[in-house]
Swiss-Prot record:
Binding annotation for Ca(2+) 1: 48, 50, 52, 54, 59
Name of a matching Pfam family: EF-hand_7
Keyword Calcium attached: yes
One GO CC term on file: plasma membrane
PANTHER family (UniProt xref): CALCIUM BINDING PROTEIN
Molecular functions (GO terms): calcium ion binding; enzyme regulator activity
Biological processes per GO annotation: microtubule cytoskeleton organization
Binding-site residues, Ca(2+) 2: 140, 142, 144, 151
Domain of life of the organism encoding this protein: Eukaryota
Listed name of the protein: Calcium-binding protein E63-1
CDD domains documented for this protein: EFh
Binding site for Ca(2+) 3: 176, 178, 180, 182, 187
């Protein structure tokens, strides 16, 4: 299995969970497929940095920051409070799955409303581009537009796919087309697509 396999899907699911509209109203949810549940569990594991089975406000804020999204402490605490049924400021895996389900239902509802209003299909290419940019930001930790060897290694560890030196070197040889020792956005997208 390639170290990059599933990364885009994992980040897309995480992005849906973190960037969707706040899910406060009652909406009709579609049940998740087995693949979606697996991906959501992976996304939860990405958030749960200390592996205690719960996501804290700090863990959520850390991931958002790595996605290039700066949000206030107040918004982070609102998101956690909204998702946590126990009111303890922590989200367990079951609460996370329910929360994402509500967010997806809201997104589906919003897309269907926009489609009926504009009579335009949802442009999937825009979704892919947004996913790729979010994924690139996770890897490009210093935001300089390039993924260095160290950033690649750190990001792969963060998503639960640690690489040994040989695997890291192989990935860089494959991805670094201009052989400048770092991966730019174009090289990154070619690697994932």
């Amino acid at each position: 299995m390639s170290p990059m396999s599933g990364l885009r899907q994992q980040l897309k699911m995480l992005g849906t969970a973190l960037l969707g509209k706040r899910a406060t109203k009652s909406v009709k949810k579609k049940p998740f497929t087995e693949v979606e549940i697996k991906d959501l569990r992976t996304a939860f594991d990405l958030l749960d940095r200390n592996r205690d089975g719960r996501v804290t406000a700090n863990e959520l804020q850390f991931m958002l920051k790595n996605l290039g999204i700066n949000v206030s402490d107040e918004l982070i605490h609102d998101l956690i409070r909204e998702a946590s049924h126990s009111g303890n400021g922590l989200i367990n895996e079951a609460e996370f799955l329910q929360w994402v389900g509500r967010i997806q239902a809201l997104r589906d509802e919003q897309h269907s409303h926009e489609d009926s209003k504009d009579s335009k299909p949802v442009d999937e290419a825009d979704d892919v581009t947004e996913d790729l940019i979010a994924a690139f930001r996770v890897f490009d930790r210093d935001g300089n537009g390039f993924i260095t060897r160290d950033e690649l290694q750190t990001a792969m560890e963060m998503i639960g796919e640690p690489l040994n030196e040989q695997q890291l070197e192989q990935l860089l040889v494959i991805a670094d087309l201009d052989q400048d020792g770092r991966i730019n956005y174009e090289e990154f997208t070619r690697l994932l697509l």
